[in-house]
Amino acid sequence: MNIPKHTDTLVVGSGTAGSIIAGRLASRLNQKVMLLEAGPDFGPINSKKWPADLLNGTVIAETHDWGYKSASMNGQPNHNLERAKAIGGCSSHNGCIAIWGSHIDYDTWESYGNKGWSAQEVLPFFFEANSTLRVRDFNTSEVTPFHQTFVTAIEKTGIPRTKNLNDLYENQGVDISAVNILQDKRFNAAFAYLDPVRENGYLTIAGNALVNKININQNKANSVEAIINKEVTLIYAD
């Protein structure tokens, strides 16, 4: 792949956030966007290049991981710290649970001066993300004995069953979470935000491109050094 040395906007890392940012910017059709990802780009959802464990929404993926481990403390063993190294980042790797959280967090952030982060102001974006990421509830046929046993056990502790785990104003409750699984496939952020703009002429995706330095001039990042095909490549954001 011939990597352009200049682009309008550079996005480093195609994790969940990077995929969303690059996809949204490229959809505006007014600037060239380059997305650099240290791991491989397996292409769109129908490319047939995706490893089975990254697609399978019923298991936690084990491949294409950075291999981080926690430090051993007080004689305790190291623990794996799963961080995906592939297009879509950890949205290509995780348990597909879609939980919005509590209004308390968002309203607290806004009270600290972060305007626009109140629960009511972020709520429309949650609905939009749910639609784009194909978030849905489990079908009755998908509910396993484990799910049922877990929910029943939690109810016995006094925590009530809730009809909607994503009610920002429901402060406690148990239920089976919504998931971003489409036809048994983990519907990751790359599928949701990059696939629609892959061929529009405004987005370039460079997989296996490890950024090892961001160059800053006058408090503004203007270029990066990336290792591509074992060579250091300088790419500018104009």
Where in this protein do the model-derived segments appear?
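N-terminal redox-cofactor-binding region of secreted/periplasmic oxidoreductases
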Residues: 1-238
